[in-house]
């Protein structure tokens, strides 16, 4: 069920990248700070707390961060248990920031139809653009006890509306 939400209520105000310079990590880490704003004067919106998909296109040097569930490919079978992803409420007329740590070196696993998985190692230190997509809704996502794992992911992929924004960003090493 799609709602007629006022898409101008939720905006991605900023996505900022910084190199994490802590000595706690052997490999480099990138601190990503996402700023969301709820401009509504009355509505509370719910968003997923953690990214559901991260991708890097080395050709365009674009880092994509998704706080939404993509639709499952037809040939993928899901075998994990049902769960409700962590969600955060953004109160009316409020701006919130989330911080994540991503590795500078990421492994991208793809499985072309009928073939074995391909593992590609990506270095995101030369990023020039960040695209962020966030799903939001006026009600939190809830799992029905009768839903199986695949049904949960399909329902989550159809939950709410999405908003996207892109930002020109570079890492200073």
Protein language model regions, located:
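Short structured motifs
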Residues: 15-20, 81-86, 114-118
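Hydrophobic core residues within well-ordered beta-strands of beta-rich domains
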Residues: 30-32, 96
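Asparagine-centered strand-capping/turn motif at beta-strand->loop junctions
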Residues: 34-43
